[in-house]
């Protein structure tokens, strides 16, 4: 169920969700049988319940966007939090437009989560900052420069899973209009 407001240069969305799932396939380390490796397994009954807020606006030449999510990802059989699912997550973005140049920043923040079904291995929350610049030099051609994880943050979405450090991208894009 959701509500939406569009007006006066503002877009706001509020959504409540309640999903009951049967035979949900999830991943965990170690496996429920105790073997110390990551494996997929079945959760008989699960509930994903929560609330999402999102909004966007433009202030002069700056576009602003934000989203916040709160959820209770629950294994209904055990009553525990589902593995590798944070209860809180947020995204914030701003970009500045000046003619054919657009530059921006994105911040992603994720709360802590458990790496395993018994909820004994907690993974820390994290925040990542990304920066980008796009130059549209013709209607069809643009150049993109991007840096993800600017602070070179070490973080885990799964125990001992190698996530990217600081990453640089450059791309030339052609789009048929």
Roles of regions detected by a PLM:
Residues 2, 46-54, 87-89, 126-132, ...:
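Transmembrane beta-barrel architecture of outer-membrane proteins
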Residues 4-6:
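Short beta-strand-to-turn element immediately C-terminal to the catalytic PLP-Schiff-base lysine
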Residues 10-22, 30-32, 37-116, 136, ...:
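Gram-negative outer-membrane beta-barrel transporters
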Residues 20-22, 60, 109-116, 126, ...:
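C-terminal beta-signal and adjacent terminal beta-strands/loops
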Residues 43-45, 82, 121, 125, ...:
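Residue-level "hotspot" positions that anchor or transmit function at local structural transition points
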């Amino acid at each position: 169920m959701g509500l939406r407001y569009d007006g006066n240069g503002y877009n706001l969305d509020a959504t409540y969700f309640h999903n009951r799932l049967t035979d949900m396939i999830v991943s965990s380390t170690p496996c429920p049988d105790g073997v110390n490796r990551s494996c997929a397994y079945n959760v008989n009954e699960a509930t994903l319940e929560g609330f999402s807020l999102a909004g966007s606006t433009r202030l002069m030449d700056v576009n602003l966007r934000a989203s916040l999510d709160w959820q209770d990802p629950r294994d209904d059989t055990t009553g525990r939090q589902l593995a590798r699912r944070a209860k809180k997550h947020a995204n914030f973005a701003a970009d500045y437009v000046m003619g054919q140049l657009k530059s921006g920043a994105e911040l992603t923040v994720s709360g802590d989560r458990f790496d395993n079904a018994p909820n004994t291995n907690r993974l820390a929350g994290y925040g990542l900052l990304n920066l980008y610049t796009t130059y549209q030099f013709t209607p069809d051609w643009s150049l993109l420069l991007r840096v993800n994880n600017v602070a070179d943050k070490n973080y885990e979405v799964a125990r001992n899973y190698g996530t990217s450090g600081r990453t640089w991208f450059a791309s030339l894009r052609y789009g048929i209009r």
